[in-house]
Amino acid sequence: KKMVAEGLKPMGQEYLDILKEGFENRWIDVYENEGKRSGAYSGGSYDSHPYVLLNYRGTLDNVFTLAHEMGHSVHSYYSRKNQPYAYSDYKIFVAEVASTCNEALLIHDLLKKTSDKAMKMTLINHFLDKFKGTIYRQTMFAEFEYLMHQKAQEGKPLTAQEISSTYLELNQLYFGPDMVSDQEIALEWSRIPHFYTPFYVYQYATGFSAAIALSNKILEEGAPAVERYKTFLKGGSSMDPIDLLKTAGVDMTTSQPVQAALDVFGSLVDQMEEMI
C-alpha cells in the first residue's frame, strides 16, 4: 500500500484520499482463499463503492496489480460520483487508461528511488514485458483479426490451416528473424477468447499508449495536468471516448501518443542495455 501511495503522489491529495479510503474501508479482498477465483479485477455498482479482488502474495507483480486495479476503482469512483446512472460506466476504449497510468507513475517512482542495479533491471524488465504484451502483442492480435475479416470478405474459406498459417506468419513478422517460433504457436489463436468479441483487442494498445502520454504530462506539468486528468476520470460515458481523452490532453486521432509510447519503450531498452 505504501509503495503504491508513494508512486501515485503526483496525482495530488484528493486522489490519494480516495486511495486511502479504499485501503482503509475494506474495498479490497486481498489474499488467496479456498474456493476463491484466481486473478484480479475491480467491480461494483452505481450506488456502492468499488470492490477489488486480489490474490496478493507480496510479489512485485502483485504491487503493480494493486496499482492497476485501484486505477480502475478510482476511475469508477469519480465517474459514478459525477455522472447520472446512464453515463456512469466508461467505454472499453478508455477502460485501461486509468489503470495503466497508475502503473506508469509507479514504475517511474520506483526507478527514481532505487540505486540497486539488479532492482532497476528487474523493474525495467517488468515494464517492458507489460509493454510488449499490451502494445506489440495486442496489435498483432488486431492485425490477425483484420486479416481474417478481410479473407472472409474476399470469399476465402477460413479453414484451420489457413487461420493457423496466417497466425504463424504474423508471429514471425512481429518477433523478427532472431526469435525462433515453435510451430505450435500457429495454434494459439484458438485459445484466445477475445477474438469472440470483434475488434476488442486493439483497444489495449491504444489505452496503454494514452496512459503513457497522460502519465508523462502529469509528471512534467503537475497540477494542471492532474486537473485535466480528473476531468477525464469524471466523464464516464458522457462524451465520445476520443473527446474525453482530448479533455485530458491526449489526441488519439493522431499517431503522436503511440509514437511517444514507443519512444518510452526504446528508452527503457537502452537503459537496460547500458546496465548489462
Q: Residue spans of the language-model regions?
A:
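Short, glycine/acidic-rich hinge or "gate" loops at secondary-structure transitions
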Residues: 17-23, 82-89, 108-123, 221-228
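Short beta-alpha connecting loops at secondary-structure transitions
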Residues: 51-55, 82-92, 121-130, 149-151
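Contiguous, non-catalytic segments that form substrate-binding/exosite surfaces or channel walls
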Residues: 1-51
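Post-HEXXH active-site segment of zinc metalloproteases
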Residues: 64-65, 76-100
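Conserved helix-loop functional segments at active or binding sites
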Residues: 6-17, 40-43, 72, 76-84, ...
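C-terminal, non-catalytic "cap/extension" segments appended to globular domains
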Residues: 66, 74, 104, 112-118, ...
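Post-HExxH zinc-binding segment in Zn-dependent metallohydrolases
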Residues: 90-118, 127-129, 133, 207
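Short pre-active-site segment immediately N-terminal to the catalytic Zn-binding motif
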Residues: 45-67
